[in-house]
């Protein structure tokens, strides 16, 4: 991941932490880029643009790496350590239509 992208994600991490009221070390997350705009989703049938795998791995489609809402959505999964979508996803503005 480029230094510029990492710095941006670190800022987004701090903002989603503040919204959720949960704090954790950004550096615990391992980030992976998957080629294209989406990829076959390993967790369910269909395609993914982003996916969080416990405990601290986030996969994002290469064409989506700058998508703040998607990145923060996956970050929130990591902060919460859960794969479902409780109301905090809506409250923090990172609920995505495809996630429901």
PLM features per residue range, with description:
Residues 1-64:
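Auxiliary, metal-adjacent structural segments of Zn-dependent hydrolase domains
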Residues 72, 76-80:
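Short active-site segment of divalent metal-dependent hydrolases/proteases
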Residues 55, 64-69, 81-100:
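Post-HEXXH active-site segment of zinc metalloproteases
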């Amino acid at each position: 991941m480029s230094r510029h992208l990492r710095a941006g994600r670190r800022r987004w991490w701090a903002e989603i932490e503040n919204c959720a009221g949960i704090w954790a070390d950004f550096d615990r997350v391992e980030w992976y880029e998957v080629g294209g705009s989406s990829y076959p989703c390993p967790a369910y049938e269909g395609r993914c643009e982003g996916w969080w795998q416990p405990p601290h791995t986030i996969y994002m489609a290469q064409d989506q790496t700058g998508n703040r809402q998607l990145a923060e959505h996956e970050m929130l999964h990591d902060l919460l350590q859960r794969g479902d979508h409780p109301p905090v996803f809506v409250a923090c503005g990172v609920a995505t239509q495809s996630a429901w």
